[in-house]
Amino acid sequence: MTTEITRPTAVFPDLEGKIVLVTGAGRGIGRAIAEEFAKQKSNLMLVDLDPRVEQTAAEIASAHGTKVDFRLASVTDSARVKEVVEETVAPYDNTLHVLVNNAGITRDGIAMRMSDDDWNAVISTNLTGTHNLCKASIRYLRKAKGAVVNISSISGVVGNVGQTNYCAAKGGVIAYTKALAAEYQGVRFTAICPGFINTDMTARLPSDIAKYVVARTKVKRVGEPWEIAQAVVRSAAEFGNTYAPCAIVLVAGGMELGG
């Protein structure tokens, strides 16, 4: 399912020492994002509901020699989110430079057969969770003239059969990102839209479905988590670019163009 590709080196000196909070950071794309920031010597707070985030934080800190803390939290719990954000910024004079909203889930099913629980869970985690973090963080980000990077999905752009809840949530993230940029000057907002990425989640898909999705890309391969991570870090590194307050970035192998 993978094709050998050359991984470029991404170096952004302006991110050294910056305070970065990443949700859904225990594994997959979230872990790759955290590792990429650690390479830039940023100070990290990793947030996840999965207890494995503790081991992830320890491994990244050991590998890259930077400060990596973690918290167990559900992004759907607004009170807990507020606590985590306050604990993140307290040691740094109430400053937050970068927020990455990566936490997300899928619960697939045909629209008219989808349970209320499956619909609500996906909207709550993927869209409301993003709002909860932004709401709790915005005043600290404005102080730092920082950056918000929201992880959306190509599914929020082109739609996908069996994922009406996920598509609605991720499409909502794109619109939410644009609206926040209109409301708040001094913070740069980006929505990154990954395509079919090589993670443990996609590895569980039946091979015929995986082949179908790959065939829809222009590059005829899956993406790697580091490709999303480098797009995130690149977007965050431009937080001082006041002439680009908002960007929607598709990192999907050309899926939006048709196979």
Regions found by a protein language model. Give the residues of each.
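Active-site helix of classical SDR
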Residues: 134, 169, 177
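Residue(s) in the substrate-gating loop at a strand-loop-helix junction
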Residues: 153
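Short, small/polar-rich loop/turn modules that mediate ligand/substrate recognition or access, typified
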Residues: 185-188, 193, 243-246
